[in-house]
Amino acid sequence: MCAEKSPAEMKSIFQKYAAKEGDPDQLSKEELKLLIQSEFPSLLKASSTLDNLFKELDKNGDGEVSYEEFEAFFKKLSQ
């Protein structure tokens, strides 16, 4: 996880943005964009594009990011 956020905080952030449209357990590309821009703006600077970041997060290729995919990505970042 990100060093400054606990797992509970990360789950809360995910749920806040996932609930904006459609499935409350999945982030759409637009929801992910809003989450990253608001909560982790430096990630977009480090990543060349949102498309690349979305592809990296969406491990199963279903066009949405589950909490498990989201959590795995942030755990990897904090190592």
From Swiss-Prot:
GO terms for cellular component: apical plasma membrane; basolateral plasma membrane. Residues 13-48, 45-79 form the EF-hand domain. Ca(2+) 1 binds at residues 26, 31. Ca(2+) 2 binds at residues 58, 60, 62, 64, 69. The modification Phosphoserine is found at residues 42, 47. Keywords: Calcium, Metal-binding, Phosphoprotein, Repeat, Vitamin D. It comes from the Eukaryota. The keyword Metal-binding applies. InterPro entries: EF-hand-dom_pair, EF_Hand_1_Ca_BS, EF_hand_dom, S-100_dom, S100/CaBP7/8-like_CS, S100_Ca-bd_sub. Coiled coil: none annotated. GO terms for molecular function: calcium ion binding; transition metal ion binding; vitamin D binding. This is Protein S100-G. It comes from Mus musculus. The gene is S100g.
